[in-house]
């Protein structure tokens, strides 16, 4: 039992260091944990290819790679025409490759503990990582000894403290909130579609608890988390309504309704109680859910951040920049954080369309690999375009992971249409 817990904790750290990359104080700032996992992924790929006797890459990954190259080339054209030196997205193909090989590193690590790494295993580890980040963020904020220990090895703590922001081990600000949102969408997918979850009240409660913790604490780390909370809750609610097929209410449906209802009541009661008795938790909720408190108290749904964001909708004033951009994005040079504005200034509408097509393809190609994935693909697509209204972002990490793991759609021959990105070896479960 202890051995399994240790293995599980190590695997959770591997997933966390990939999803929430960190820079170490004792290494050059350009090196982060995701790169180490990517190197491990390359070695695992080479080993698996030699063992299998061939190097295989799925057609979906090749197509995604071609689209990433196209975007990088277009960005190169943009900065060349504009005679600028900002290569932020010119090197996107390298980011793509790092995320993909890192995802295979995560997959290879999980395979050491599980014979087959499927979507259920991946989502459970993502949920565990989300909870881990939230718990460590609270510990860092409330215990100076723990905070000092983390800051001794991980870069960034001093900046977040000066900014009065809650942070975890790699989870902070909008990038952290966006990754929390992706995790919430995937939790909702597992809750809504997986029969092993639907038939197990403990699994349902565990996932709902993880979802709730990420919603509450994750929103304090970054209010962008609420985007994933809204999308995830909408999917869970839709799935509960959809259970009633043919006009009949079954015992299983009633059990699911009761579990969901009591879980939500418990979370609400917990939040109200600690909001009343804990000054720290009171501050957390006031910050994370500022818009809702403002709406309840003043009738206006707004936050300080949205007020600032409203002033950042700036656009080019010449047709050439609208079309191909002017190759500027770094260091707030465009006077905006908004993703759409920055993409247009950097690579124009054409570049924005290429990048949008890349994410649409990556999200929707998984529909052929995973059962009941259409709504999830739609939510991931919606998440991509919603958060661009606030910041430039990249959620390819989840697509890279989905490219690597085993699929669950059956072909006509009865075999899983897995289309793994890279070859798999059969390892025994420890």
Describe the residue ranges of each PLM region.
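Alpha-helical transmembrane segments of multi-pass inner-membrane proteins
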Residues: 120-148, 171-221, 226-239
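Transmembrane alpha-helical segments and their membrane-water interfaces
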Residues: 42-52, 78-135, 358
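Membrane-interface loop/short-helix elements at transmembrane-helix boundaries
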Residues: 275-324, 332-342
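Transmembrane alpha-helices of multi-pass inner-membrane enzymes
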Residues: 43, 187-189, 233-236, 377-385, ...
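Hydrophobic transmembrane alpha-helices and their immediate junctions
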Residues: 234, 346-385, 413-414
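Loop-to-helix entry and N-terminal half of a specific, functionally important transmembrane alpha helix
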Residues: 9-15, 205-210, 364-392, 396, ...
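N-terminal signal-anchor transmembrane segment
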Residues: 1-52, 73-81, 398-401
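A juxtamembrane structural motif centered on a specific transmembrane helix
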Residues: 1-7, 48-53, 197, 248-259, ...
């Amino acid at each position: 039992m202890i051995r399994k817990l240790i293995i599980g904790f190590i695997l959770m750290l591997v997933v966390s260091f990939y999803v929430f990359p960190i820079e170490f104080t004792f290494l050059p700032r350009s090196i982060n944990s995701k790169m180490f996992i990517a190197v491990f992924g390359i070695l695992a790929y080479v080993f698996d290819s030699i063992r299998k006797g061939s190097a295989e890459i799925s057609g979906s990954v090749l197509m995604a790679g071609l689209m990433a190259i196209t975007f990088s080339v277009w960005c190169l054209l943009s900065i060349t025409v504009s005679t600028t030196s900002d290569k932020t997205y010119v090197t996107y193909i390298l980011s793509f490759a790092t995320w993909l090989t890192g995802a295979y590193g995560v997959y290879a690590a999980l395979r050491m503990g599980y014979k087959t790494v499927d979507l259920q295993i991946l989502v459970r580890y993502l949920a565990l990582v989300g909870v881990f980040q939230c718990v460590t963020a609270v510990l860092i904020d409330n215990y100076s000894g723990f905070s000092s220990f983390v800051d001794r090895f991980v870069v960034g703590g001093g900046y977040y403290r000066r900014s009065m922001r809650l942070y975890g081990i790699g989870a902070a600000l909008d990038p952290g909130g966006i990754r929390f949102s992706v995790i919430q969408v995937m939790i909702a997918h597992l809750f809504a579609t997986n029969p092993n979850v639907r038939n197990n009240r403990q699994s349902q409660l565990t996932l709902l608890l993880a979802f709730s913790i990420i919603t509450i604490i994750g929103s304090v780390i970054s209010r962008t988390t609420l985007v994933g909370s809204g999308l995830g809750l909408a999917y869970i609610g839709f799935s509960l309504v959809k259970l009633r097929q043919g006009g009949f209410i079954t015992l299983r449906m009633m059990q699911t309704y009761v579990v969901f209802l009591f879980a939500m009541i418990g979370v609400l009661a917990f939040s109200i109680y600690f909001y009343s008795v804990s000054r720290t938790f009171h501050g957390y909720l006031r910050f994370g859910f500022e818009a809702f408190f403002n709406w309840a108290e003043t009738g206006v749904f707004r936050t300080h951040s949205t007020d600032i964001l409203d002033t950042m909708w700036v656009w080019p004033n010449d047709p050439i920049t609208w079309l191909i951009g002017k190759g500027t994005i770094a260091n707030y040079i465009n006077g905006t954080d908004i993703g759409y504005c920055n993409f247009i200034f950097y690579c124009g509408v054409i570049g924005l369309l290429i990048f949008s097509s890349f994410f649409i393809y990556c999200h929707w190609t998984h529909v052929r690999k995973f059962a009941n994935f259409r709504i999830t693909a739609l939510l991931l697509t919606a998440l991509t375009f919603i958060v661009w209204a606030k910041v430039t972002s990249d959620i390819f990490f989840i697509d890279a992971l989905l490219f690597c793991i085993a699929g669950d759609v059956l072909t006509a021959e009865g075999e899983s249409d897995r289309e793994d990105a890279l070859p798999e070896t059969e390892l025994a479960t420890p």
